Structure formats: C-alpha cells, structure tokens
Amino acid sequence: MTVVGDVAPIPRRNSSTCSNDIAAPLLPECHGDEVAHDEFNGASFSGAVFNLATTIIGAGIMALPATMKILGLGLGITMIVVMAFLTDASIEFLLRFSKAGKNRSYGGLMGGSFGNPGRILLQVAVLVNNIGVLIVYMIIIGDVLAGKTEDGIHHFGVLEGWFGHHWWNGRAAILLITTLGVFAPLACFKRIDSLKFTSALSVALAVVFLIITAGISIMKLISGGVAMPRLLPDVTDLTSFWNLFTVVPVLVTAFICHYNVHSIQNELEDPSQIRPVVRSALMLCSSVYIMTSIFGFLLFGDDTLDDVLANFDTDLGIPFGSILNDAVRVSYALHLMLVFPIVFYPLRINIDGLLFPSARSLSTSNVRFGCLTAGLISVIFLGANFIPSIWDAFQFTGATAAVCLGFIFPASIILKDRHDKATNRDTTLAIFMIVLAVLSNAIAIYSDAYALFKKNAPRE
C-alpha cells in the first residue's frame, strides 16, 4: 500500500506522456520510463493473487481450528464465509471510492476523506499492525526451530531435536541467520510483484500443512480413532454463551489484507483486474481456512489448543508421527519466513511517508531505501529477541490496528461519502462493520487483559 499523496491514473504503457504529480513512493513515475529501464510490463493476474493470498494467510490460520471447538463446525464455517464476504465488501469500498477520487493509495483515499490527520492515522495503524505482526512471526519461527523455555519447562525446537543443542541452533543464532539469509534479501525488492514466486511457495507450504493434517485425520477416521465433530456450539450456561464471542477477534482479523491492495493494483498489467484478483485470493484463502478448520478440529477434537501448532508437539498415535510433526512445524516456519517480505513491504512505505512526507519516490533514493530497510529489520529483530513482554503489548495494539485497517477506516470513508457515491446499502453495511469491529476489539482487549491479569496474579 502506498500512502503519500494522491496521484493521477497511470497512462497506458504506449503513451508518450506522463503524469507530473505522482508522489507515491515505490510507484513508477511513468510506466513508459519503467519499461525502458528494466522491461517491467506489469504484474500478472496469478502473481497478484498469490501476493494478496500470502498477505491474508499468516499466523492466524493456526487459531482457526480452536474456533471450531467453540462454535462447532457448522457455525464456524458459516462465520468464515461471512467474514470473507465482509472483507470483499470493505475492499470494494476502498477501490470504488479510490476510483471516484482518482486516488491510487489507501493513504491518499484517507487523506482525501479526512485530510492529513486521516492519512497519518492510516500510516500509524499500518506501522503498529505490521511491526507487531512481523515481530510475532519472528518469535514463532524462533519457537518452532530453536525451542523455548516457559514456566521452567523447555520445549525443544525442531533443529534442537534433530541435532542436539549447539550454538548455531540456539534461538539468537537461528533468528540472526534467518534475518540475514532470508528476510534481508527478500526485503530489498522495490516492487511487490517481485515477491510473486516466494508468495506462491508460501501458499504452497500452507497447503502442505493442510494436506498433512487432512491425511492424518482421514487415517485416524478410517481406523476409528476420531469422533465425529460437533456442528453447533455447546452452550450450557451463561459462561459458555459469552465464550462464543471470544473467537470473534480471530475471525474478524483473519482476512486483513487491505494495506497491500492498492500496491498490487498499481502494478497489475491491467489494473481493472483487481476485483477478480481480490475475489480469487479470498476464495483461495477461504478454502484453505475452511479445510484447515475442519481437519484440525476433526483430528484433535476438544483437545484442540488455541494454537493448533502446539498439538503437533505431541504423540499423534500413528506410524511416522514424529516425522509428520516435524514436517508440519518446519513447513509452517518456512511459510512465515516467506510471508515476512509481503507484510514488510507496506510497512517500509508507511514509515517513509511518516518521516519524509514531501520527499520524492522511495525507489529513487537507494540511500533512504537501504537505511529504512536496515533500520526496520533491526528493530524487528531486537524486538523479537530482547523484549519479552512485547507479545502482550501487541495483543492489545494489534487487535485495534487490524480492525481499523480492515473495517473501521473503509466504513468511515463510506459514511463520510465525500463523492456522494454511497448507497443506502453501503451505509447500512458500513455501520454494521463499525459495530462488529468495535465489538471485536472490546472483546479482544477484555480477553487479553483478563488472561494477563490471571497469569500475573499471585498464586495462593
């Protein structure tokens, strides 16, 4: 997503004229110039779908089977489908009003509707959300590959289990190697389309996890080792009723990808294809989410943990169970490594917009580009390694920033209706989105605060 200023639509590639008011960083000032320099003819449809799908499928996929445990398969799958439709509607709001206002960025659209404060608010939300997400990704990668010690109990990482404890497979060493060997090179691309192959591999790794989970579930189902799952929630008292709402934040934030939509559209060979791209990505991710939820819950039932990855740290009770456990954990760690650059891309753009709002395109300054990239990666690395309470902090700020990006900001643009384009249906849907987002955020903050106080309360 680009956020600095509004820009005129890019002319057709064969045109000899260029717009002079393009100020969005990392966007070519003229497609003709861009082609002349490096033969970039626009992003493909499939590449755009994979980039958007990778933006969506991050760490949240592992929390979905636990939502089935609370909601039951029938209601849980219905909620996933509903959230996919709401996400599609909110992105459609952004694209329709961007076209009306001739904006080619989310920030430009917010600036057009709410002035400079709106643009800055959007940039801060992306900053908080994406830094938090990337630090959490790095923490998870460290936990999976190097292990962790919690409450005096050491949980072995995959590499530690394979090779024993050595300096090179310790947490700090693994994260340093990953940062220098994977994150830094992938973060150096100036176009989001350059990440299409790593994004495709990232989606493929998520599918590998799904295939392994499905295979184990089917094997155990045939052998009679799996009970039929509940289709509806088990509500027996008021506490179990209120417990249903604790999964709302997980579902509401499951499809957040809005901060990358404009960047992907701007690089498309045919920008009008962005709506089919969005719908294809949402259909792909919905299918992966639904199948993961079904087979994850089918496999572990009421023993499904909040993070189903933790269930693969136990004995599966099947031949080659330990090998399959390691395959799931390694594929997931590799998946997160490849998600990292697609989430990092809009983070760098927004930091540049906050620090240098009137500067030329970030792609024209290698020094600024390099310094921002190195600085942000360093902050994320240090946060994941040396700030033990940072996960708790981002549980609060992350929930707030994510629902703002996905629902509150798009709905607010509709309610502002600067171009008189909103219908009664749009207004009703926008109000519903805001109510849902506020409810989700309140539940998430209450649940996280309650869990934190309970965790830190002195034991009797």
UniProtKB/Swiss-Prot annotation:
Entry GO CC: organelle membrane; plant-type vacuole
Domain of life: Eukaryota
Membrane topology term: Multi-pass membrane protein
ATP-binding found in the keyword field: no
Location in or out of the cell: Membrane
Sequence intervals crossing the membrane: 45-65, 66-86, 120-140, 172-192, 199-219, 238-258, 281-301, 336-356, 371-391, 394-414, 427-447
Gene Ontology terms: biological process: amino acid transport
InterPro entries: AA_transpt_TM
Keywords for this protein: Amino-acid transport, Membrane, Transmembrane, Transmembrane helix, Transport
Major localization class: membrane
UniProt xrefs under PANTHER family: AMINO ACID TRANSPORTER, AMINO ACID TRANSPORTER AVT6A
The family this protein is said to belong to: Belongs to the amino acid/polyamine transporter 2 family. Amino acid/auxin permease (AAAP) (TC 2.A.18.6) subfamily.
Protein name: Amino acid transporter AVT6A
Native species: Arabidopsis thaliana (Mouse-ear cress)
